[in-house]
Amino acid sequence: MIDAVVVSRNDEAQDICSFELAAVDGSLLRFSAGAHIDVHLPEGQVRQYSLCNHPEERHRYLIGVLKDPASRGGSRSLHEQIHNGARLRISAPRNLFPLAQGARRSLLFAGGIGITPILCMAEQLAASADFELHYCARSSERAAFIERMRGAAFADRLFVHFDEQPETALDIAQVLANPQADVHLYVCGPGGFMQHVLESAKAQGWQEACLHREYFAAAPVDTQGDGSFSVQLNSTGQVFEVPADQSVVHVLEQHGIAIAMSCEQGICGTCLTRVLSGTPEASRPVFLTEQEQALNDQFTPCCSRSKTPLLVLDL
């Protein structure tokens, strides 16, 4: 864990604030484009926020936070309680959304607050890589970091699309035409926006291996069909029943076995656990690729279920 202090807080757009964090002892760990940190909030919540400053910077971490009406308390706490000089505990950076090695060209797509990891990618790619960035927002008032991007070295590769300005509409079919194996796509934003970009890419013939995404929130899941199952800990042989209305994490907690977790939605990867036997319900760790899901060898015990009566976990 890192003890951090809020050096500055700025309004970046309507309902979006940035928070510049520095280590109390002056040292911060390296990070790569696409990385995020866990932020431990005053009321006990832990939330993940993408780093959006240049990845070569070592003196600060910059995060952007949307005050979401559907917030479970995290974004509201930051907006209403955290000001300059506030102390926060944060994790080391972790990256589940890295840039692909060896890509000849990159297409970056961001919707709303999804600009945060994408902006960091653009900063890294700007030095020597071929890319373009498409940023979609409802209006100019809701476009975060827009002036920073328009003044950046990659401004000529920035394309901004506002819902209120139909003439700026994104022609996704044209942008995604002629897919190639060494061209990679990255997308982050609201679920509907991401689905539109990814489905459009697949319709154009893009390979799954070239499609990269990061979700900030999981889509609603119908849990009515959830049933009970059992998990076995490989290290001890203990077996625990998981009722339909409880998660694996909560069941293990009741027996004194703690698993680090954060989002409880299968999006952050904190609790990702190897499955040694049995078949997990693979769609709920939404950050896994289709190929990774097909392996059936890992799942997120904060929310994932099982297709088989027993899962043997690498715990």
Curated annotation (Swiss-Prot):
Q: List the CDD domains hit by this protein, alphabetically.
A: fer2, PDR_like
Task: Name all 2Fe-2S ferredoxin-type domain ranges.
Answer: 227-315
Q: Name one GO biological process term.
A: lignin catabolic process
Q: Which InterPro entries match?
A: 2Fe-2S_ferredoxin-like_sf, 2Fe-2S_ferredoxin-type, 2Fe2S_fd_BS, Beta-grasp_dom_sf, DmmA-like_N, FAD-bd_FR_type, FNR_nucleotide-bd, MRET
Q: In which pathway does it act?
A: Xenobiotic degradation; vanillyl-alcohol degradation
- On whether Plastid is a keyword of this UniProt record, the answer is no
- Enzyme class of the recorded protein, top EC level: oxidoreductase
UniProt xrefs under Pfam families: DmmA-like_N, Fer2
What one GO molecular function would you report for this record? metal ion binding
Domain FAD-binding FR-type stretches = 1-100
Keyword entries, A-Z: 2Fe-2S, Aromatic hydrocarbons catabolism, Electron transport, Flavoprotein, FMN, Iron, Iron-sulfur, Lignin degradation, Metal-binding, NAD, Oxidoreductase, Transport
Cofactor(s) in the UniProt record = FMN
Question: Which residues of the sequence carry a binding annotation for FMN?
Answer: 1-94
Could you name the domain of life of the organism this protein comes from? Bacteria
Q: Which family does it belong to?
A: Belongs to the PDR/VanB family.
The protein depicted here goes by the name Vanillate O-demethylase oxidoreductase
Q: What is the lineage of its organism?
A: Bacteria, Pseudomonadati, Pseudomonadota, Gammaproteobacteria, Pseudomonadales
Q: State the gene name recorded for this protein.
A: vanB
